Amino acid sequence: MSASPQGKVHTHKEILIILSGLMTGMLLAALDQTIVSAALKSIVEEFNGLEHYTWVVTAYLLTSTASTPLYGKISDLYGRRIVFQFAIVTFLLGSFLAGASTNMEQLIATRALQGLGGGGLMALTFVIIGDIVPPRERGRYQGYFGAVWGLASVAGPLLGGFFSDQDKILGITGWRWIFYINLPFGIAALVITSAV
């Protein structure tokens, strides 16, 4: 992943490495749009937050959507890799804090932070692919991202339901794992995007 859109031509191996990092980031952002919905009942019960429950999902979607156009311009100014990695770190920070939330207001605020990172993960994935592959091949790569999106749409509610049905996993309340599960995958995406 070059620092600027112009310049280096990547080998097929480098493109595959970059693609794996981008697909991991896309999976995280897409998964978090659906994983929470199945766990809302458990979250509301723990926090007595019925009046605010819709904001748990809406905060993520709103900030993700609002931040998406900003990431393209910011990455033009500062480089694709650093801005994509900033989006990963922001998403991971939001994920960790969401899992550690002690009330509904904290959860909503940290979901908004998570959405700021998620917007960058979604937007920059397509920008970076546009930078590193020729126009003739972009459709194939966008198809891969469509498959990731489809997988996340199906897996999100299933994982959310699984985690929220567990009383505790490793001593942590089950629904909190819908956020903590992002951490190892996000760290892997950071390592992968640093490799090229």
Where are these predicted regions, by residue range?
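Transmembrane-helix bundle of Major Facilitator Superfamily
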Residues: 2-195
